[in-house]
């Protein structure tokens, strides 16, 4: 269970689950991961792609350490949530999860199936995800549950909340305004992390 406290927000327990695994969003939580001794694995990603565009070996050491730790615990949901070496509430991941739950309701209604449990879960998600909006910085942030720390990285994934449609026009307007400014001084549109 990735949401044992029923907050409506699920955790990712490995950066690979996010879909943007070598993002600087994960640098701080990953730096806290102690690499297991005598770790062994073989990389192929840096053989077919320019190694400068791939994570460093120390990053991969941490990825594999987390993966091995999850495997040792047999992926037991009760164990891994509490003891995972990496446990982050990711706004991008939760935005996609929220949107998928909303889409699921449409399907359930189409087939005249009960959607009350999911509707209640969505209400909880929409309420609690707003706790991750920083009014001063005017953006959402991820939260490192393991180390109890906010992750303030200006990631393009923070805008996925617009896709989830939380029906908060004030926040939506702020995000749209910020999104329009995201590329003003950049060579490429919508870089995953906004340069300073």
Question: Language-model segments: which ranges?
Answer:
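Extended glycan-interaction surfaces of carbohydrate-active proteins
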Residues: 7-88, 126-196
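Short, contiguous, pocket-lining structural segments
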Residues: 85-99, 117, 121, 153
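Extended, well-ordered alpha-helical scaffold segments
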Residues: 1, 100, 104, 111-129, ...
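Well-ordered alpha-helical scaffold segments within catalytic/enzyme domains
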Residues: 95-113, 160-170, 196
């Amino acid at each position: 269970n990735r949401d044992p406290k029923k907050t409506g927000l699920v955790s990712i327990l490995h950066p690979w689950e996010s879909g943007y695994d070598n993002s600087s969003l994960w640098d701080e939580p990953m730096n806290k991961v102690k690499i297991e001794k005598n770790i062994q694995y073989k990389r192929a990603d840096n053989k077919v792609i320019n190694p400068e565009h791939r994570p460093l070996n120390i990053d991969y050491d941490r990825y594999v350490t987390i993966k091995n730790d999850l495997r040792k615990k047999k992926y037991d949901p009760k164990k891994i949530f509490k003891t995972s070496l990496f446990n982050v509430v990711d706004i991008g991941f939760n935005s996609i999860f929220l949107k998928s739950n909303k889409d699921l309701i449409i399907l359930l209604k189409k087939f005249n199936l009960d959607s009350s449990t999911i509707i209640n879960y969505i209400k909880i998600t929409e309420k609690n995800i707003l706790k991750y909006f920083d009014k001063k910085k005017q953006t959402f942030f991820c939260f490192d549950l393991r180390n109890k720390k906010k992750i303030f990285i200006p990631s393009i994934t923070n805008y996925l909340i617009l896709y989830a449609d939380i029906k908060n026009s004030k926040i939506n307007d702020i995000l749209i305004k910020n999104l329009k400014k995201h590329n003003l001084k950049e060579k490429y549109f919508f870089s995953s992390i906004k340069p300073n």
